[in-house]
Amino acid sequence: MKKETPFGAVPRYLVGDNGPSVVPGYDKANFGYASISPIIPVEARSFHTVTLTYTVGKLGIDDTGAIRVCWRMVSDAGRPQMDNPSGENFVTATSSGEGSLVLKFEQLGGQRPWNETLTIYQRGGYLKEGDIITIVFGDKTGGSPG
């Protein structure tokens, strides 16, 4: 029989998927919102282009802020890369605001099961309400197949 810790049993809300406990809020006006296009069925292990558009909320993003896109480690998604525009799975990000964006992919960057993460850091300026960050997965403009 397991003994309880001095603080009692681990609360149920701390066990399992952490999504609800780490979401900063659901208010689109304050935190912004994202949309993905196109939303269509795709064949596994085929190349496509998908655009994620994030609209900044009232709180903005400062010059050290970031947004993060996470997905499950077990998937048929290719590994995103930002170094070779003609290579497979090339990813780009642009914003309508000040400064520049820096992208970082980590295969073990999130908490299970959302291990794979793409973090988009804001540098050298601020994003204000209504500014747009556009992330293109499989950007074909440099010759990538998607």
Where in the sequence are the language-model features?
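Ser/Thr/Pro/Gly-rich, low-complexity intrinsically disordered stalk/linker tracts of secreted
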Residues: 1-146
